[in-house]
Amino acid sequence: MPAEPATKGNRRRLMHTRSVECNGFLRDDGLWEVEARLVDTKPFTQAADHYREKLKPGDPVHDIRLRLAVDDTMQVHEAEATMAATPYPTCIEVQPILRRLVGENIGKGWREVVRRKIGRTEGCTHLSELLGPAVTTLFQTMSHGDAPEGQNSLETQQNSGKRPFFIGGCHSWRTDGPVVADKFPQFATKPAARD
């Protein structure tokens, strides 16, 4: 296994790769859907044990997928998980747990809902972690509305008259910043006095 380039004078060797891929869709029935996949691999052979066979370099330690379908209000209509590769056979016992999220709304308090509905020992850490980028992908998927061709990225929100969910969510979208003042002046506040 080749060494990676030096960083600040230290040589390094790749030991683990986690890949996360999320894709968002608009379905014919009007629901928005996200598919998310998490794959963990190692660049070296892992010995067999009584739970699984030997893993060759690049074989997945985890290969976990989830799918969520929501409506325009972000209410969850469908939620499912599949696990093609796990370190232990008991891991797949948690696949049905995402169904507990059906009927819930994604928005403020979502992380607490996930903790309450899925918990720690009834769920899978990696599956719960995958919900984060999956939900972010849903927001990005829905941001242009259902007829996005030719629109700029904010046109749908600007035309709705409603305060977009992302205002106040980061430095660029702070209410006292120049971007909100320019794009959504009705939601802008005066900049705070600086010392």
What are these regions (language model features)?
Residues 24-26, 40-195:
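Active-site- and interface-proximal helix/loop "cap" or "latch" segments in soluble metabolic
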Residues 1-45:
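Short, Gly/Pro- and small/polar-rich lid/capping loops
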